[in-house]
Structures are given as structure tokens and as C-alpha cells.
Amino acid sequence: MQAEQTRCAAARGSAEMESLWHAAPGDEEIPLHPPPTPGAMSLESDSSLDTLAEKIECDLMDLLGDMGPPCDIDEEEDQLFAEALPPLYSQPTENPPPPNAANSIPEQAGKQPAEGKTNTERNERPMRRKRREDGDVGQPNPRRRTHARSRSPRAGSTSSQQPPSSSGGARKPCVRREAGDRETSEKPARGKYCAPFPRQAPHQCQSPPAQTASQKPPPRPQRPPSTTAYSPDRTPHDHQERRHEGAGKMIRSVVTKQDARKPPRRVPHRGCGTGRHGRRTPEKWGAPPSMVVPLKFTREYWEKHRNELKKPVWRDYSRSACTARDPARAHDSGAECPPTEKRDERRTCAPSQPRWLREDRNAARFFDKAKDAFGGLALPTDDMCTRNRDLLRAMADEVVDDDDCEDLDLTRQMCFPTMIGPQSRAAGPVGARMDSWSELCRRAAFLKARWSSQPSVTRVARAVRSLYLTNCSFDELLEACDETLTWMLWHQFEDERLCPHDPIFSNIYALVQGLVTRLGAVLHCHLAASKSPLADPTRTSELPLQSATCPLTLFLTFADRFARVMHGHPHVTLVGHKIVDHEGVLRTLYLPGMCARKIPVVLDQHANVCRKEECRLLCAQLLGKQYTVGKFLCCDLYA
């Protein structure tokens, strides 16, 4: 009976509160309690009034907004309210049991709603809130913040006494939380579940602006794909997508922020990509070609001017009258300039097939591809040796010619005696070989003056002498040894200072290396047999020229002394001749031409006394001048 009266009172109180809410204007104060009636006073008791006050207070707090969680709500009511909330707002314990049918359904069935609180009444508040947001009910003023929650005696209440709370203590005033504040650890613990405030679903608790901000923006309308492969209103990335679609797989291009800011560029249609660079492929429409190949390097130009393009660019050729490009020059010289085809046939002849190619089928099948490699069987008919000899003579003329040169041919023949051309206008034959000491002194003085005053002549002479010593024969190598000792002897005779960087002294090392290479094991065996100090590899002191036992050891001792003196002074340009030969022993032991005449005799004597087959064989090969003994195969199929 008591429960029935409580429910009836709660229903009447809720109806009266709703009527008062509809009747109250938006900016006026809302009365906390309706005026008491005599019928209601007779039926209400202390417990029913307490329940009604709690109901009205919750309704007011729902209308006023988020004022903070209540501090003394019953634990049973919290558990029931947590059931009504979605799973997102129910905070379980640290290790909740896994949800399954075995442990969740019996627990829900065993729970009973609390007395005076039904699920229908709890669900009415969200529905009324929803109707107010839709516009059915007048919206309250959000700026009104009145009536802090407290349990002090209310004005107009029929009961002046306050019933004790479930916790046994007095109510504490709730403090309103501002938007954006975080919950601190000072919030009191409230049982197994802690339900947030206000007690509505998350989509109902938010204000209309917050709901609008949380919603996802509608998807942007996509442009339908174009049916044509290339259109002027599409970007280069769209064209790339269309090209990938044809392969059966859509590959979208990665568009960066910088590309997104660029305005769309109009792309020409297929076949319209022409301009000053010529026709281009669709892939290169966006940028000019990286390199424009000139007409000079086309295949047709190369086939037509093959011989001209194959010439080294550093060679300054003097064209003959028949090959001159200027017809006037050809006419003045009395020769007729032949056409290009005849000139090509004269320069490069294509002979008929060799006899082995016509008769030997096995060889023709075996060399089917090799006969066409690197230009095939066509060979140049020009005399390569004559052409390069003329080129070397032209380079010598260039370095020799100066203001003091009266006769170019004579000056060239004096500086480079072996460079004697067929058009020489010299009075007499000029060569490197001389039979008198006075003639040698005149030639040596001329070379000394030229090498000291013209560095270009010195540079060219040094280079050609180094190549000569590397490729000369054994007899020429012995003559080079005589040339070095004679040059030293002339400096002693004229009391001239030595120049370590002249063409003769600067190539002493190359001369010694040539001797060691050609003599090989014979040199080591001869030095050991004659007990020469040169055979000691650990020697650190200089050897005197008096220690020489033969012309070969004399030259090697002189080269050793000269190298040791110049090793400590690499940048010295002039050195006294007494540093190398202080006592002048060389002029007492050496006569010009001794090396070329006496060293072969020394090798022959060593071959007679040595028992090693290697020494006898090597000496016989060098002295017998049978340089063709080492050739075993010589086949020339181009003939």
C-alpha cells in the first residue's frame, strides 16, 4: 500500500512539474515546488515528499546542464543507471569476465529494479530532452545558472526536517565543472560502476554546435571518368591513370601538396605536341627534350663523312690540293677535286674476297662473323708510317721555329738529327753519327744553347728519347750508353755545369732499365763472377769510378753515382760536373764509342766461361742478331 501511494504521488508530481514548465516563460524564475494542495497534503508522507523532491531536483539539473556529478547517490541507483547506459559509458573493473551467454544472461535476469524507480520513468527524461531539441518544447536559457545543489531546507516544503542520506552524512554542495576541465583524482569513489553526468546518451548530452562539429563532412563528389583517353581539361596525373588503366591495373599517381597548389595545365591532344623541338612523344609533353641531337651526328651524316669524323681533333692536317674543300685552291694547284665517292674509294679500298674465303668452306663457316667485325676486310691504303713520320716532323718544326731561326730545315736537323725528310735543303748530310771531336763539340754546344733557351724543344726531345730507349734494339741501346758518357765527357772538357733535366741526363734511369731487361740473368751472373760491388743489394755508399772492371760496369757505376747525387736535389736545374766525377776519372777510362764496341765482347767472353745454358743461349741470341728465332706462328688472313 505504501509503495502504491508513493508511485501515485510521484506520477502526480511529475505531471504538475511538466505543466508548470510549459506555463513558465523562458526568462522567468522556475518555481522549485508546485503549491501544495490539501488533497496532496493528506496523502503525502515524509518518504513520498523526499522522493518527489529528488525527482524535481534531477529534472532541474537536467535542464540546467552539466553541473557536476551528484555526491551522494545510492549505490543501487548507480548500478541500475549504469545498465541503462551504453557499454561505452559503463566502466568495468580492471579484469572483467569475458561476455558470454553463460555469465551475462543469468546476472541480468536476477537483478530487480529498485522500488520507486522503473525503466519507463528513467527513459522518459531522454525522450523529453530529444523533443526539446527537435523544437517541440521551448528551449531553456543556457546562461541561467541558479540554485546550487544543497540539502538545506527548501522554501515552501511541508517538511522542515531533512531525512538522513544513505551514507549517513550531510550532503556536500556540488561544484559546476567548466567545459574542457578534466576530472581529478579527488572525486570520491562511488561503488563498482562510476556513471558520468549528465545521465543521457552521448549523442543527447552534446549541444547542437558540438554535434555539428563531431559529424563527418559529407563525401566530396567525384568527377566521373572521361571516356576519351586524352582531354584538355584533365591533369597530367589523370592522363597517367588512364595510361595505367589500359594495362589492366589502376595505379593512382601520388600528388604532393606542391602539385595540388598548381593550376591544372592544358595538355595537347595526341598528334599536337609539335613545336621548335619537333614532334615529341606524349610522355614528354610536360617538358622540353633534355637534349637536341644536331644534324651533324645523325647516321646519314656519319656514313657520308666517316673518314673526316674519325680523324683526331688535335691533329692539324694539311690537306692536299685534290682533297681541298675550296675549289679555288684545287684550281690554282692544277688538280681537279674528285667527287666524294671517288675520294672514299681511294682512301679505303674494299678488295675482293680472299682466296681462303672462296675455297675453304670450313674456314668461311668458322670465320663467318669475324670477317665482318671492326670494319670487315676493307683496309686503308694510305701509308700509315709515312703519314705519322710527316706529322712528327711537323711537330718538330713547330717547336724549333722561332725568331732566331734562319733556316728551318737546318735548325730542325741540328736539334733532331734523325728527323731528315725527303725535302731537306741542307748543304750536306746531317746525322747523329760524327767522326771527329771538334764536330761533336760544335753539335753539343748548339744543343746546350737550344735546350737552355727553348723549354718546348727540351720537352719534345725528352719525350721522344724516352720512347726511343723503350723500343730500340740492343745495339741502339749500347749507342745510347755511349751518347750519355760522351755528353758527360763534353761537360768536363768545356767545364760546363750539368743540367739534370735535359733530354740525355733525365733518361738515364730508362737506359739502365732497358739494359737490365735485355741482359736479364746474364747481368747478375757477370757481376757475381767479376766480384763487382754492384752485385751487393744492401750497399748504401757511393762507388768510385775506379772500381769499374769493364765498360759495362763503368757505365753502371756512373749511372749509380749520378742517381745518388740527383736523388737529394730533385729540383736543382744546374749542378757542377765535379759532384759526379770529382777527380775526372771518366776521361782517363772512357773513349767515345767504347760501349758499342766493347760490351758485346764482354758478353761473348762471359758466354764462353759460364756453364749455365741460360747465359749461353741469351748471349748467343743478343750477339747473333737472330731476333726472328722467337717467332713461331704468323698468319695473316687479310692478305
Swiss-Prot record:
Residue spans of biased composition, Basic and acidic residues class: 175-189, 234-247, 326-348
Renumbered zinc finger spans (CHC2-type): 525-615
Molecular function (Gene Ontology), one example: RNA binding
GO cellular component: host cell cytoplasm; host cell nucleus
One matching Pfam family: Herpes_UL69
GO biological process terms, semicolon-separated: regulation of DNA-templated transcription
Binding site for Zn(2+): 525, 606, 610, 615
Function in brief: Multifunctional regulator of the expression of viral genes that mediates nuclear export of viral intronless mRNAs. This immediate early (EI) protein promotes the nuclear export of viral intronless mRNAs.
Family, per entry: Belongs to the HHV-1 ICP27 protein family.
Record's protein name: mRNA export factor
Organism of origin: Psittacid herpesvirus 1 (isolate Amazon parrot/-/97-0001/1997) (PsHV-1)
